[in-house]
Design a protein with these regions (language model features):
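Cys/His-clustered metal-coordination modules, chiefly Zn-binding fingers
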Residues: 142-220
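Short helix-coil boundary/hinge micro-motifs
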Residues: 1-176
């Protein structure tokens, strides 16, 4: 049986993706699991980090949704059921598109309905299974979910639960798009003044700073 883990902490929604190497295609700057999943497709040309099913499993592993052992189990099952794996990738991209629409529409009012709510509930409807708390080898604790039935269908459940939490807790007013138009990544603004502009100061923020410096030099 395969278990999916989530480091989301109810009430704060904080989660900690695993550190990635410099050459990793995965970037985690969204501060929320569902936003980082949206960011697996980014840029004006929409570079897709989920190129194939194995890429998706590696992303889930990097985001700490799957641990190494469980990721290996999913890969073995994908070899045995390639059609199911391919269908789950298509489904994950469909979910990602709905979550992007949610991230980009901003705060919702009582008079504005979110059309993607049906998509969220479609995935949550799969969530038959067992939830439990497990302790890692390093002593930390995680919540885990053991789905009943199709293991592929449960892969995106922790992601959609993260988005559902954001809706319930009214977090959409703090969701931003990176100010660099070439980036297109979204993030949760956890600053006190709510004025964060860049997904990451070390990349997009520094590029903007360098561009302003060049313009300043030209004007002198």
């Amino acid at each position: 049986m395969l278990t999916f883990t989530s480091t989301s902490d109810a009430g704060t929604l904080a989660y900690v993706p695993r550190p990635m190497g410099e050459r990793s295609p995965f970037v985690f700057v969204g501060e929320r699991l569902w936003l980082d999943f949206v960011n697996s497709e980014f840029g004006i040309r929409r570079f897709d980090a989920l190129r194939d099913f194995d890429s998706m499993v590696r992303w889930l592993e990097a985001a700490a949704v799957l641990d190494a052992e469980r990721a290996s189990g999913i890969r073995r099952r994908a070899q045995q059921q390639p059609a199911g794996a391919a269908a789950s990738l298509i489904d994950a991209r469909r979910v990602r598109a709905a979550l992007r629409a949610l991230a980009e529409r901003g705060p919702l009012s009582d008079r504005v309905r979110f059309d993607g709510l049906g998509e969220i509930n479609r995935v949550l409807g799969r969530s038959a299974g067992t939830r439990r708390v497990e302790q890692r080898a390093d002593g930390t604790f995680i919540r885990s979910f053991v789905p009943v039935g199709d293991a592929f269908a449960g892969l995106v459940i922790p992601i959609v639960e993260s988005a559902a939490d954001a809706l319930i807790l009214g977090e959409l007013s703090r969701v931003r798009r990176c100010a660099d138009p070439r980036c297109q990544r979204v993030f949760f603004d956890n600053t006190k003044n709510g004025r964060r502009r860049w997904c990451d100061m070390s990349t997009c923020g520094n590029r903007a700073k360098a561009a302003r410096h060049r313009e300043k030099l030209k004007s002198h």
